[in-house]
Regions:
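Charged, low-complexity intrinsically disordered segments
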Residues: 1-138
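Flexible, D/E/H-enriched segments
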Residues: 137-191, 206-306, 317, 339-436
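Beta-strand elements within well-structured catalytic alpha/beta cores of enzymes
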Residues: 191-197, 289, 322-330
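Non-transmembrane, aqueous-exposed alpha-helical and coiled segments at domain scale
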Residues: 309-324
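Divalent-metal (often Zn2+) His-rich catalytic cores of metallo-beta-lactamase-fold enzymes
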Residues: 330, 336-340
């Protein structure tokens, strides 16, 4: 089904949504640049020259030069960002708001002193609202999830590839375990990969610790993790699908952080290298999805599994015929710190792989303590696999999954390597619906 955007029907109102954000991204970032005295002085000295240094559309520049806030809003401006511009010019919020109503400043102030604008006469027309809420026809075409890939994202694996060590005796067994996977991926190239990973203190430090981060930008460069960026292609995003997913997941009560700019580290690039090899450009678009598994509390397996189910609904309600894969990365058992560093638990890992296939809902109930005790402090990354598993159609009985490949190997640096490919075979009734 299409997403509910009836907020657009409220008269005289611009709700700043993903469409507005995309349209006005550089306009609003320009406004943010005015938060330093030096930049404010430069702007006031030559407004046109300052604006020309930004990748703004001419309509956006003209709106600012003409002091036309309604035009700036139509061009994607947000009032809180535009307030920085207004403050630079000496405007108050009342002056800015009043300028958009057709009233003089004195008339607007008098209205506010008198109690403000009444809501009567400023609501949505009921007939228009009822028509908007009429049951829409399901999309003729929609995106489908074709499969899930689960894999460890060990940084040393990326280093082995980058330094031509893949044929060394230590590393050869690891890469042999992905030979089938690369062939499968060549035969099943998706349009988009929704790639679940965790950042390793590369894009996020302790000044900002979001739980779930959805990459909504057009491009994501490779992070420098202390050794220089990996020599791999940057990632091309899919802002339209990402915006749709954001709207759907947040509507389903998952609180996301949206990142229009984001560098991606080995958590994302190593899985791509393992599945696609050494390429000049990744063969599909990638939507990064970061999960905090670094600082407790981290999301539970149950929450991640529920998010995966909601993700499937989001993707299948997108009205473009895209093939989408969902990847869950990280793990398996490993501990990188403390006297227990080096912990590996083969038995637990393989039981996890078994249950991931046959009992994902039960596996989602495993508590954090078991992950840490049995799989090591960094083994908690495995909750991210449950997002990808929750997105498969067998979870709600509307399809089946097929195991195409399974691989497990120790050692790979400090970590047990696990890998699984599930093909998704939904039935043809239509997009998924339902509750979390």
């Amino acid at each position: 089904m299409s997403l509910d955007k009836t907020y657009k029907l409220v008269p005289g109102t611009t709700v700043f949504d993903a469409e507005q954000s995309a349209k006005g991204y550089h306009l609003n970032q320009f406004c943010m640049s005015l938060m330093t005295a030096e930049n404010r002085a430069a702007y006031l000295a030559d407004e046109r020259a300052y604006l020309d240094a930004w990748p703004l559309r001419e309509e956006q520049k003209r709106a600012l030069l003409d002091r036309d806030l309604n035009a700036a809003m139509r061009e994607g401006g947000n009032i809180y960002f535009l307030a920085k511009w207004g403050a630079t010019l000496g405007f108050s919020f009342q002056q800015m708001a009043g300028s958009m109503t057709g009233m003089t400043e004195e008339e607007y102030r008098a209205m506010m002193v008198g109690g403000g604008r009444p809501v009567d006469g400023n609501r949505i027309d009921h007939a228009v609202l009822e028509a908007a809420h009429a049951d829409p026809a399901p999309p003729v075409e929609h995106a489908v999830i074709t499969g899930a890939v689960f894999t460890s994202h060990v940084p040393a694996i990326g280093a082995a590839m980058d330094h031509a060590k893949t044929e060394e005796p230590y590393w050869r067994p690891v890469f042999e375990g992905y030979a089938f996977s690369r062939q499968w991926e060549r035969e099943n190239v998706p349009d988009v990969i929704f790639l679940v990973y965790n950042d390793h203190a590369s894009a996020f430090d302790l000044s900002l610790i979001p739980t779930f981060v959805l990459g909504t930008g057009a491009a994501f460069p490779t992070a420098d993790e202390g050794y220089g960026p990996r020599p791999v292609p940057g990632v091309e995003g899919d802002p339209d699908l990402a915006a749709h997913i954001a709207h759907s997941l947040i509507r389903d009560d998952f609180d996301l952080t949206l990142a229009n700019e984001l560098t991606v580290d080995h958590g994302l690039t190593v899985p791509l290298s393992l599945m696609f090899g050494d390429v000049g450009k990744w063969p599909c678009k990638v939507i990064p999805f970061h999960v905090n598994v670094v600082q407790y509390p981290v999301p539970s397996g149950a929450r991640c599994f529920a998010l995966g189910r909601a993700l499937r609904r989001a993707i299948e309600s997108y009205d473009r015929p895209l093939k989408v894969q969902v990847w869950g990365t990280g793990g398996m058992s490993h501990q990188l710190q403390g006297p227990r560093a080096g912990l590996i638990n083969r038995e637990w890992d393989n039981a996890f792989l078994d249950r991931l296939v046959t009992d994902p809902a039960g596996l989602a109930g495993v508590p954090h303590l078991e992950y840490v005790e049995e799989a090591g402090s960094e083994g908690i990354e495995l909750v991210m696999w449950l997002i990808a598993r929750g997105a498969m159609s067998d979870v709600d009985g509307t399809g089946d999954v097929e195991v195409k490949h399974r691989f497990y190997h120790v050692p790979a640096s400090n970590t047990a390597v696990g890998h699984l490919i599930l093909e998704n075979h939904p039935r043809a009734e239509g997009p998924a619906e339902g509750e979390n």
